[in-house]
């Protein structure tokens, strides 16, 4: 590829609509750039992006990691270049190829606690795969862990999602401060989701980050979720699609 891919990472507190907005970004990119290669990465162990995009996942990134580790532990010594080649092949083999985009899920490690190993692997995968795509959308893990561990180090656009709550805005303020030190992003902005009344907007305080869009409560999206339908079933004028479009336009992606 001749130009740098645009890698859009979406982060924020859990439960604020991060995954839904990530899915809306993917849909918009497929509509505006139908001839581009687009990759959606579900980097959240809560594994919701597949449902939001209508994708059935059979194998995850963590499945690949564990399989390769097991082959090293159980078999003869193998050269690092051989393992890297196998990992690259397996990753592409594991991708779900839809008509308009490709999809890869991080998965959910079976053991409780730290996701350090799979996050370290994810960082390498993002670097490995991004050169093969025009646009990459990453639905990040809730909170700050993946930012803190430099998993998102090379993203070009960082989009922080919050609701109007003070807890939500505090989380994205913290993510932004850490990202300023650890992420080599080109543009960063925030989306405030589920704004039930415009009168709330002056009371929402976000430090040092441009607000890209305020998205009101979206009854059509809530109904879509309840019915288990994908973001592609939402009307074009639904609040979440309009808000996502506004945000990507301000970031000069659309």
Segments (PLM) and residue ranges:
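Phosphate-binding P-loop
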Residues: 1-5
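Conserved catalytic-core segment of NTP-binding enzymes
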Residues: 34, 117-223
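Conserved beta-strand scaffold positions in the cores of enzyme catalytic domains, especially
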Residues: 7, 38-40, 101-103, 211-214
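C-terminal alpha-helix
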Residues: 243-254
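Walker A/P-loop NTP-binding active-site region of P-loop NTPases
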Residues: 9-78, 135
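Short, hinge-like loop/turn segments at secondary-structure boundaries
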Residues: 55-59, 178-179, 205-208, 230-232
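C-terminal boundary of histidine-terminating zinc-finger modules
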Residues: 227-238
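P-loop/Walker-type NTP enzyme "switch/lid" segment
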Residues: 45-127, 226
